[in-house]
Design a protein with these regions (language model features):
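Single-stranded RNA-binding regions, centering on S1/OB-family and related RNA-binding modules
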Residues: 1-243
Length: 243
């Protein structure tokens, strides 16, 4: 056996050992965000959507980390990946002493600190400003490992009164908005509704019952047909038929 064949056989044997060890090791899963350390690289190898960074196995994507001899991340389709500066929509899930816990549809709950409100709020009576179940249009101002902090200190942010909230795949949001807002303005004008689109895929619609339903159906059409050509024409036709 020549040297090249011997090296090839050794590589195959090493790969087989790693594969068998991975199968035999009991694997665990946990939700991770990009940049999060999953485990030490001392006893593990990076797999899909992970990397070795300074001796640690680190996640490259949002998803479920599967931890065995080889560590990989299974991406979760359609999950919202928060970024600083995003304007998003969420619902108050809990009222704390120093702020509100907001469900924004991501892997972690977000927090709106009391000091990020644009006006004075009595910390002993915070539910007068926002209570559990209230919908809010907020901005992401900080993203750290395992936490997202929000703010209301920008124009157009605040509590969303009445209406309905629907949810779409956040990756389809640009198609719903359209170039320079053309698509969403088309729907607003036709249905006579107020619409706020959150970059997390939550969309608030307010108008007459008929208008809200029609707007919701139009947005559902966009989500279904987002990969196809002639989308604007299809939406115009749909809206025209519903008059």
């Amino acid at each position: 056996m020549d040297k090249e064949e011997k090296n090839t056989q050794t590589d195959v044997e090493e790969t087989k050992e790693v594969s068998e060890a991975d199968v035999q090791t009991k694997k665990e899963r946990k939700l991770v965000v990009p940049g999060e350390t999953i485990v030490s690289a001392d006893d593990h190898l990076p797999g899909d959507y992970t990397r070795n960074e300074d001796g640690d196995i680190v996640a490259n994507r949002y998803g479920l980390a599967e931890i065995g001899k080889i560590v990989k991340v299974i991406p979760i389709s359609g999950i919202y990946e928060p970024r600083r500066g995003n304007t998003i929509i969420g619902r108050v899930e809990d009222v704390m002493f120093s702020g509100w816990v907001i469900d924004v549809g991501g892997p972690y709950r977000a927090f709106l600190p009391l000091m990020e409100c644009p006006r004075f709020v009595d910390k002993f009576n915070m539910t007068e400003f926002a209570n559990v179940g209230d919908a809010m249009n907020v901005k992401v101002w900080s993203v750290k490992k395992g936490s997202v902090d929000l703010s209301l200190k920008s124009r157009g942010l605040g509590k969303l009164e009445g209406g309905r909230i629907i949810r779409i795949n956040p990756h389809k949001v640009p198609r719903v908005i359209g170039k320079e807002g053309s698509m969403i303005n088309l729907i607003k004008d036709d249905t006579q509704t107020e619409i706020t689109v959150g970059q997390n895929g939550y969309i608030w619609i307010k108008g007459s019952e008929e208008g809200e339903r029609k707007a919701e159906d139009a947005i559902a059409l966009i989500e279904r047909e987002s990969a196809n050509d002639g989308l604007t024409g299809k939406v115009e036709k749909f809206l025209g038929e519903k008059k």
